[in-house]
Regions:
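Acidic/histidine-rich alpha-helical segments that form the ligand environment
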Residues: 81-117, 219-257
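Hydrophobic alpha-helical core bundles mediating ligand binding, dimerization, or RNAP-core interactions
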Residues: 12, 16-19, 57, 100, ...
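Conserved catalytic core of Hanks-type protein kinase domains
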Residues: 25, 49, 113, 165, ...
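Extreme N-terminal tail/first-helix region
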Residues: 1-18, 144-161
């Protein structure tokens, strides 16, 4: 996955910098529902978890940047997360939100001041991937245009290449975990859901009365496998990229209020963000 200084700064500014504001725009009932879905009692508890990992990761990144030794810990994630929530539980909400934002701004400033070469360090990249990039997807409570486009432009553009870089044994292991016979079938599955999501989103935008029936997942997936079975691998890969680019253009042109539509947001979040983590290729 391409982790660069500029992309990291973009995440800190455009994704995390709007994170709280976007959440606050949701109706109160929807806020509570989405926080509970994340497994937290309150939004502040979830932010405390995010904040604690920022602080932990940046401590290590600073040490690497300065050539200092740092403790290599084996984390018990349940304990670490519980301690983070407990630490900030007594804080007044306004005081905590101010602290969260100041920490975000300082983190962005610190990363901006660091040498570009630091972002090539394996441990730095690993921490940034966890606390900046993966955390944005893991704790997705409101979808942004930025995150949607970033996933399509960066992560999905490298998806097939990432699979090809695996050795044959790792490829077999990955497909076995996915319950699929071939990477061809996986691409067919992804393409089909992208196309279905785009069809529904354009229908919603085109007509207030637009309706659709959610497909039976198993039957739809089987249909997609059959639909693209006769396609060559090369043709399917080209079509994958055509559909990906079409999605980029569609998302780029969506009106701002489209992301406040629960159905549009839901389809984009499922197809572009969650789908990526449902079929993760680790290299």
């Amino acid at each position: 996955m391409p982790i660069t200084k500029q992309r990291t700064l973009d995440y800190m500014q455009q994704e995390w910098g709007t994170y709280v504001e976007r959440f606050k725009c949701l109706p109160k009932e929807e806020q509570e529902k989405r926080v509970k879905r994340q497994g937290y009692e309150s939004f502040q508890d979830m932010l405390a978890h995010i904040l604690a990992w920022w602080e932990e990761g940046m401590g290590i990144i600073h040490a690497i940047a300065e050539g200092r030794e740092f403790e290599r810990k084996k984390y018990d994630f349940d304990i670490f997360n519980a301690e983070a929530v407990a630490k900030y539980k007594p804080w007044d909400e306004a005081e905590f939100m101010d602290h969260f934002e100041k920490t975000r701004q300082q983190m962005e400033a610190d990363l901006r001041s660091m040498n570009e070469a630091l972002f090539e360090n394996r441990r730095v990249r690993s921490w940034l991937n966890g606390i900046v990039f993966e955390h944005a997807r893991e704790h997705l409570v409101t979808l942004s245009r930025f995150l949607t486009l970033d996933m399509l432009v960066h992560e999905w553009s490298e998806y097939a290449d990432r699979f090809q870089r695996l050795d044959s044994e790792k490829q077999r292991e990955f497909l076995l975990k996915q319950g699929l016979d071939s990477f061809h079938d996986l691409l067919a599955h992804i393409i089909g859901w992208w196309e279905e999501g785009a069809r529904i989103i354009m229908g919603i935008l085109g007509s207030p009365g637009f309706t659709w029936i959610d497909p039976d997942v198993d039957q739809f997936n089987l249909m997609l496998t059959k639909k693209f079975a006769s396609w060559s691998d090369d043709d399917l890969l080209k079509h994958f990229d055509v559909v990906r680019i079409a999605l980029i253009e569609m998302v780029d042109e969506l009106p701002d209020d489209a992301f406040m539509n629960k159905d549009i947001e839901g389809w984009l979040a499922a197809d572009v963000v969650q789908h990526f983590d449902e079929h993760p290729i680790r290299t």
